[in-house]
């Protein structure tokens, strides 16, 4: 079985991005800038933000973090976003989830300039994706990362049956729409399964490409997978494991041991889709910079 190594691809991609950033710095004296806003002190969010800042530094991009108190009002957050929208040195704006209850997440998404929405969550970017205008939008980072993996590993997709398990706005919906597009690493027949789908295994067993993004550890088992299928595991779940020092470990939505015995290719957890998400965030930020400076 082929292991689709997202960690390796993300390192390669960041090296390629650094070359482009260095070229732009030499030619213009400018570099892409990413600003992350974090509201509150969620420990997991703090880790994600640190990882993003580290990756920016590795590629030569400028990054900044705006920390706001958990009691911050929605209007105060929207005001900061408007300031960043008007800042020519900021090319990507990311508001780290989750947000406190007093803040409407959709209002925050709408407030971000679509040209700086490097998370790809703004309705304008999602609409352009659905319409097939990928050269004029930002694609949500996790689906975009999966597309990059399929392309770099030369996975045949044209005319294949892709089954996406999960319908979240972050992964499932944009992933399904992306796989419908007429691109080298897409152009599939697409089925979406979700919590209300009856007899999910009857669909997953038809998949040439199975993408699991349901948020349940080990949900996809070997008897649900077509022999020879390509399996992309988006899930990141922490489960108890007394054998580890911490007492827990990360597990995907797919039973790796069982499914790896029959799949032709598969992403591991960790080290599969996860590292690609941040890499594609940087790629989107660079693309925003290039569009803003007419460098494409």
UniProtKB/Swiss-Prot annotation:
A GO CC term assigned to this protein in UniProt: cytosol
Pfam families from the UniProt entry: THF_DHG_CYH, THF_DHG_CYH_C
Assigned keywords, A-Z: Amino-acid biosynthesis, Histidine biosynthesis, Hydrolase, Methionine biosynthesis, Multifunctional enzyme, NADP, One-carbon metabolism, Oxidoreductase, Purine biosynthesis
Taxonomic superkingdom: Bacteria
Pathway where it operates: One-carbon metabolism; tetrahydrofolate interconversion
Recorded catalytic activity of this chain's protein: (6R)-5,10-methylene-5,6,7,8-tetrahydrofolate + NADP(+) = (6R)-5,10-methenyltetrahydrofolate + NADPH; (6R)-5,10-methenyltetrahydrofolate + H2O = (6R)-10-formyltetrahydrofolate + H(+)
Any one GO biological process: methionine biosynthetic process
Record-linked InterPro entries: Aminoacid_DH-like_N_sf, NAD(P)-bd_dom_sf, THF_DH/CycHdrlase, THF_DH/CycHdrlase_cat_dom, THF_DH/CycHdrlase_CS, THF_DH/CycHdrlase_NAD-bd_dom
EC number, as in UniProt: 1.5.1.5, 3.5.4.9
Keyword Transit peptide: no
Record's keyword annotation contains Signal: no
GO molecular function: methenyltetrahydrofolate cyclohydrolase activity; methylenetetrahydrofolate dehydrogenase (NADP+) activity
Binding residue positions for NADP(+): 166-168, 195, 236
Subunit field text: Homodimer.
HAMAP family referenced in this protein's UniProt entry, alphabetically: THF_DHG_CYH
Role of this protein: Catalyzes the oxidation of 5,10-methylenetetrahydrofolate to 5,10-methenyltetrahydrofolate and then the hydrolysis of 5,10-methenyltetrahydrofolate to 10-formyltetrahydrofolate.
Family designation: Belongs to the tetrahydrofolate dehydrogenase/cyclohydrolase family.
UniProt-listed NCBIfam families: PRK14174.1 (NF010771), PRK14186.1 (NF010783)
Annotated protein name in UniProt: Bifunctional protein FolD
Gene symbol of the encoding locus: folD
